[in-house]
């Protein structure tokens, strides 16, 4: 095997091993997050709502306002809310 193939093989192996380590770290973090949700649930918090709060905190105010307006538009169209959205 030529030296170039050996280098490519070593690089490929290094990438695969790095990805495998990161995947394991990701699993560990996901397990930790699950544990925190379990703690919150044990303290009486609604984890479904907690997840929504976390998702909302990831968005900026403008994005949240746009989504709320669209949601209200859909709900109004379906007769689920009375007042049409103000936008």
From Swiss-Prot:
- InterPro entries, alphabetized: GapR-like, GapR-like_DNA-bd
TM annotation in the entry:
none
> One GO MF term, please?
DNA binding
Pfam families on file? GapR_DNA-bd
- Give the family, as the similarity comment puts it: Belongs to the UPF0335 family.
Protein name per the record? UPF0335 protein Avi_3695
Organism for this UniProt entry:
Allorhizobium ampelinum (strain ATCC BAA-846 / DSM 112012 / S4)
């Amino acid at each position: 095997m030529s030296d170039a193939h050996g280098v490519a093989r070593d690089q490929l192996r290094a990438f695969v091993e790095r990805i495998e380590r990161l995947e394991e770290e990701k699993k560990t973090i996901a397990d930790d997050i699950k544990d925190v949700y379990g703690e919150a649930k044990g303290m009486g918090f609604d984890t479904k709502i907690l997840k929504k709060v976390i998702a909302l905190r990831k968005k900026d105010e403008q994005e949240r306002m746009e989504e709320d307006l669209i949601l209200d538009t859909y709900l109004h169209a379906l007769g689920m809310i009375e007042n049409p959205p103000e936008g």
